[in-house]
Amino acid sequence: MRSGGATTGRRGKWGLPALAGGLTLLAALSAGCAGSEPQLPRLSDLNPFAEKEVPLPGKRIPVALTEGHAGLDVAPADQPIVLPPPQANDAWTQPGGTPYNSSGHVALGSSLRQIWSADAGTGSSSYGKLTASPIVSDGRVYVLDTRGRVTSFSQSGSTVWRVSVTPPSEKDQNGYGGGLAADGGRIFVATGFGWVIALDGQSGKKLWEKNLMSPIRSSPTAADGRVFVVSADGIARALSVSDGSELWTHQGLIEKASLLTNASPAVAGDVVVMPYPSGEVVALRIADGQPAWTESLARTRVASSLGSMTDAARPVVEGGAVFAVGHSGRMVATTVRDGQRLWSLSVPGIQAPAVAGNNVFVVDTGGQLMAITRADGKVAWTTRLPGSTTWSGPVLAGSRLWLTSNKGQLVGADASTGKVDVQLKLSGPSYIAPIVAGGRLYVLTDTARLLAFQ
């Protein structure tokens, strides 16, 4: 496959490139590829879509066959990419946009320019990586830096307030990881110090705090009167949004070494889907924390210690199905209700997919962006993203898929063909997916610069 080209094809088999570098590890490991896995039978019981969908213009080109991972089925070349109409959104209250980690197709202008840049605190250093996604709630943008400081920004980029959530007995450089979620006018902060803290969104005043006694490297999700979070010891918890009291816990498998990723739970009806560093994806009943079903993203065959890393990306719930991908090379779609597997692909990834209409868009660990047919898991097109193999995203906005890279790039790819038709230079590298709210796209760079585009 030619570098930077978008390709599609006839029915057949094709492979993905080998895993590439650029990932921050908690242990020094060597790179490798996962083994092959057959695709499971297709099921067609996904929920129908209420909104009218319009095929996007653009010519699709055949998917080329590449060496590397196991073959994947290819969708018919004459099958159009269809998207639901873009919807205006004024908030991005969770790391995944919504409590179910699916933002759909959001509205965004066709021509972007940077309108402001702001200092959001301390970025990555030798102590730890900046991994927490910004959020937008009630007209404010909120950022958590690597020193345990939360900053609230106005729509013009000015600082409204900044508070430290570092415990008095801790050094602030140990506060990396964690994340933010908003609900009911409150900002919920999960920290690398092991605390979950509720702040008033308007003033930054601390409302309550809860010590989980274990670092939190992933982001929380707030919904249905609860804050859901997974700590580094593999324990999932549900806390009350009113006072932080513990409602239930669930112990997942413990993984001694993992990638420094930042996933978050997905709420879907009466269950919450928890991603664990072990590669487990477990649906727990919101009422009592009892497991409803379990899926594993871990591969049975691996070629190296890096390939054995099983971290799960942020699961996405859309239309009665859960879409999840793991670093070790497995991507699955299952039903929310009972965890029945719809399809499975050999795709390694640590970035949450974007789901809209009958399309699932995902970038793998080698920098290959692809469109997958939601109903049956067939590949519609693939694109080798330019200049880097380490990408964060995608988010679907204004009919484009937006991603950032470790080389300081912001790119937009046409969702109908995969062609990259927008490339912007950032002030620094970014390892966090863009977010979109109020017709603006926000990027947080690795040096903790918050950039706004409109």
Regions found by a protein language model. Give the residues of each.
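Blade/loop signatures of beta-propeller domains
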Residues: 54-72, 79-115
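WD40 beta-propeller blade core
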Residues: 151, 197, 237, 282, ...
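Short loop/turn segments that connect beta-strands within beta-propeller blades
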Residues: 154-158, 200-203, 240-244, 286-289, ...
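Extracytoplasmic beta-rich repeat domains
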Residues: 37, 116-135, 162-181, 208-223, ...
